[in-house]
Amino acid sequence: MVQWKTLTKRSQGANFEQKAREFLERNGLKFIAANQQFKCGELDLIMRQGDTFVFVEVRQRKSNRFGSAVESIDYRKQQKWLDAANMWLFTRHKQSLDTANCRFDVVAFEGNDPPLWIPNFLG
């Protein structure tokens, strides 16, 4: 069950990122890193599935009154996500999105529903 207590935005985000990490690990992904920040953007979770780097965006909404958690990932956010992933790949592995095997997944939490996992969100 999702806890919607009065937490700061940052601690609430960390709580959902931890829940997403545990969910993905139960589904066979291996944890690499969390909260990787660059000037161009941030990566919530970096996981690995086989030889594929998985860059995970974690989103949460108490309700979908103002749009769903998934709908909140607009074009600008997608570009920042891609830029941050490219930066991480270069600084850690001297690779790029063009050379590395990677994908972009979303784990969304809405109300008390179970997490919604969307593999390969950016297709």
Swiss-Prot record:
InterPro entries: Restrct_endonuc-II-like (IPR011335), tRNA_endonuc-like_dom_sf (IPR011856), UPF0102_YraN-like (IPR003509). One of its GO terms (molecular function) is nucleic acid binding. CDD domains: PoNe_Nuclease. PANTHER family: UPF0102 PROTEIN YRAN. Belongs to the UPF0102 family. This is UPF0102 protein APL_1363. The lineage of its organism: Bacteria, Pseudomonadati, Pseudomonadota, Gammaproteobacteria, Pasteurellales.
